[in-house]
Structures are given as structure tokens and as C-alpha cells.
A protein has these predicted regions:
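A short, Trp-centered hydrophobic/proline-enriched beta-strand micro-motif
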Residues: 123-132, 175
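Hydrophobic, small-residue-rich alpha-helical packing segments that form membrane-like cores
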Residues: 136-139, 143, 154, 161-163, ...
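A short core secondary-structure module
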Residues: 157-202
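Alpha-helical interface subdomain recognition
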Residues: 1-91, 108-112, 124, 149-154, ...
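Flexible, small-/acidic-enriched active-site or ligand-binding loops
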Residues: 142-144, 196-227
Length: 391
């Protein structure tokens, strides 16, 4: 048992969680991983992977029992994200995005909203978190989508881009600005939009470098009328909802990245144990041992921090934003480094599509960009040490 396997074995899973993780690993190895190259090539949505995940009831793990769920720990959720992402990064994003979108509804929705909307998610529905716009990426306060109250309804107008699951979802958590509130931050609000609502359209999907089977869509809202009952909290509460949600979704992005990192690391180790040069296996050369040692050490440290942040979130620690940013930053940078090094370790083979490290290198890049670019996370972390000047 190597150090990564010992780290996994040390996690205090319950018997139920252990059984579920075993089932997820089996599904990932036997069905999801063998399909990954096909979906990367065709960029088709992996409906069979989603069906298999739903057959295990995985959506139910982050939904309370009162709404049809079977909740397990946040750490177990992160472990499932990592296992699925190691097999297929696209499928990992699809499933993790469900959590990203459903979590605001669970944390901030009222009882009527939860009773009405969560059971269909527990049964396997798809959801999307809708934030980014052409003029509002890292600075979400620049969004232009508007919510205008009209009696018992809200009229939504605007557009969104780069929305994961945007072309396939049943529910959308949409952020925009309340027309009757001034201020870029103060006006941000959040609503639930259901598939098929008149005036809502999908205007296109992106042809991406990596995670090609995960749909990334552009959305348009033209006089979309939704019930006032679909407003989360009160008008102007959107920024609070958004920031709280990101603190829980960023560790999920880190787990996704660590799945990619694990896949690339394992492929590189297998190749270097098998490939011979000058009468030796590659991993018998000291220089490559040093390379592997550095990657393994960083992987162990980042995964240890993953479980630490999960523990903080499960204990309802009041301030985990910087911890989540550190995790997202280090996990995603490491995924890109390990995937790039794996291509180098495999030489010419690593550059060919017959070996999945080529795909993993492309898949890893998005992890440094979405859920806050790593430049933004560095700014957040650095700024947290800035002391207020005394006046």
C-alpha cells in the first residue's frame, strides 16, 4: 500500500459510506472510465453515465431525508467527486455541478421551495448554477441580468455564458439584479428557473479544449416570467447566497481536480514501472524518482487539506472562504502540473490520444479557470493578510 492508498484508508468513513464508495469506484472503473475517450472525441453528453450514477442514488446523498434524500457526509461527497472525475473529468463536472446548484436551495430556500423542488433532484434531476455573463466573470457584481417585480411574478431579462449543465438541466439557480434596488452589490438576487419556461432559451454551447462531454451553454432570458415564489430569500440577498455557495463548491472543484491529478499520476507511475531504457525501468532512474517524490508529496499534502476543509464545513465553521480558496488554488495548479508532467514522462506516447494523459492535460486546464480564476484566489488569499491602517 503506497502513501496515497494509506491516506485514503485513514479516512473515518461510516459503514454506509464505505459501501457507497466501493460501489462508486466499481462503477467508475467498469463503466465510466471505458467510455471517457469516446465522449471526449464526440463531445456528446454522457447520458448513460448520468443514468448509472442515478441508479446508485448519488444525488440523494446531499439532500435531507425530509425531501427524499439520504444524506451522507460532505467528505464522502468530495470523495465521490474525486472518484468519478478520475474516471471521466466531464462526468465529474456534471455531477458536481448538481451539488453546486442545489446547495443554495437547501441552505436558503424556504420550506415550500424545498418541498416542491428538491424531491425531483433527489430522484436524479440535473441542475445548473447560473452566474457568469459576457461582462461579468471574476467580478460577479458586473452582471446585467435583471429581475423586475410584477405582482406575483418576476420578469427576467438578460443573458449568461459558460454555464455548466446549461443545456441539459431541469432547474437553474439564476443570479441577477433586482430592478428596484440601487447598487451593484446590494441589488444582486437569486431565483429558481425551471426548464421550459417561456422566453428562456439556450443560444449555443461551447466547443472546448477539455471536459468536452460536459455541456457549457449560453442562455438568454427574454421577458421570462417566473413566480415570485421562486425568489430565494429576499431581494438583495443574492450576494450573501452566492458567497456562501462558493465556499462549498470550491472544495468540490478541488476534488474534481484531484481526480484528474490522481489519474495522471497513476498512469505515469504505471508507465514508468513498465517502460525500460538502457536496461532499466524508468522509475529506477534517480532523477525520475525525485520528480515522482515531489509530485507525490504535494498530492498527499493537498489531499490532506481537502479533508481538513471538509471537516471545517461539516462543523459549520463560520469563516472558511480563505481555506477553500487555498484548497482550490493548490489542487488545481497541482492537477495541471501532474498532468503536464505525465505527458512528459510518457514522451511521444503522452502526446498521442491513445494514452489518456493527453486528455487529462486538456481536462486539467479548466480547473484553474472556473469557480474563480487562480489569479483571483491568490488575490483573495493575499488580501486576507492586509491589516487595516490606523487613522
Amino acid at each position: 500500500m503506497n502513501v496515497l492508498e494509506r491516506l485514503d484508508a485513514a479516512q473515518p468513513w461510516t459503514q454506509e459510506e464505505t459501501m457507497l464508495l466501493d460501489s462508486v469506484r466499481q462503477l467508475a472503473a467498469e463503466k465510466i472510465a471505458p467510455r471517457a475517450a469516446h465522449y471526449d472525441k464526440t463531445a456528446e453528453f454522457p447520458w448513460d453515465n448520468v443514468k448509472d450514477i442515478n441508479n446508485l442514488g448519488l444525488n440523494a446523498m446531499f439532500i435531507p431525508e425530509a425531501y427524499g434524500g439520504a444524506p451522507l457526509s460532505y467528505a464522502c461527497y468530495l470523495a465521490c467527486v474525486r472518484e468519478i472525475s478520475e474516471a471521466c473529468a466531464s462526468t465529474g463536472i456534471i455531477w458536481a455541478t448538481n451539488f453546486h446548484a442545489i446547495k443554495p436551495l437547501m441552505d436558503f430556500g424556504n420550506e415550500e421551495q424545498k418541498q416542491r423542488l428538491l424531491p425531483r433532484m433527489a430522484e436524479g434531476g440535473l441542475a445548473a448554477l447560473v452566474i457568469t455573463e459576457p461582462t461579468a466573470g471574476s467580478d460577479a457584481t458586473g452582471m446585467k441580468t435583471t429581475f423586475t417585480p410584477d405582482g406575483d411574478s418576476i420578469i427576467m431579462n438578460g443573458s449568461k455564458i459558460f454555464i455548466s449543465n446549461g443545456d441539459v438541466s431541469d432547474l437553474y439557480i439564476v443570479f441577477g439584479k433586482w430592478s428596484e434596488i440601487a447598487g451593484d452589490k446590494e441589488s444582486i438576487s437569486a431565483v429558481v428557473l425551471e426548464k421550459g419556461t417561456p422566453g428562456f432559451s439556450i443560444t449555443g454551447t461551447e466547443d472546448k479544449m477539455g471536459t468536452r462531454a460536459s455541456g457549457t451553454a449560453s442562455l438568454a432570458f427574454d421577458q421570462v416570467r417566473i413566480p415570485r415564489a421562486n425568489l430565494l430569500c429576499e431581494p438583495g440577498d443574492g450576494l450573501k447566497i452566492l458567497l456562501a455557495s462558493l465556499n462549498k463548491s470550491r472544495p468540490s472543484v478541488a476534488a474534481h481536480a484531484l481526480g484528474i491529478a490522481r489519474a495522471a499520476f497513476n498512469d505515469a507511475i504505471a508507465y514508468m514501472n513498465d517502460r525500460r531504457q538502457s536496461g532499466k525501468r524508468l522509475l529506477e532512474f534517480q532523477g525520475l524518482q525525485f520528480n515522482v517524490a515531489d509530485l507525490a508529496a504535494e498530492l498527499v499534502m493537498v489531499e490532506s487539506w481537502l479533508w481538513r476543509v471538509a471537516q471545517l464545513i461539516e462543523s459549520n465553521a463560520p469563516n472558511v472562504g480563505i481555506e477553500a480558496s487555498i484548497l482550490k488554488l493548490k489542487a488545481t495548479d497541482l492537477a495541471m502540473r501532474i498532468a503536464t508532467d505525465a505527458v512528459q514522462f510518457l514522451g511521444g506516447y503522452g502526446y498521442c490520444k491513445d494514452y489518456r494523459v493527453e486528455r487529462l492535460m486538456r481536462d486539467a486546464k479548466i480547473t484553474q479557470i472556473w469557480e474563480g480564476t487562480n489569479q483571483i484566489h491568490r488575490q483573495l488569499i493575499g488580501r486576507s493578510f492586509l491589516k487595516k491602517e490606523k487613522r
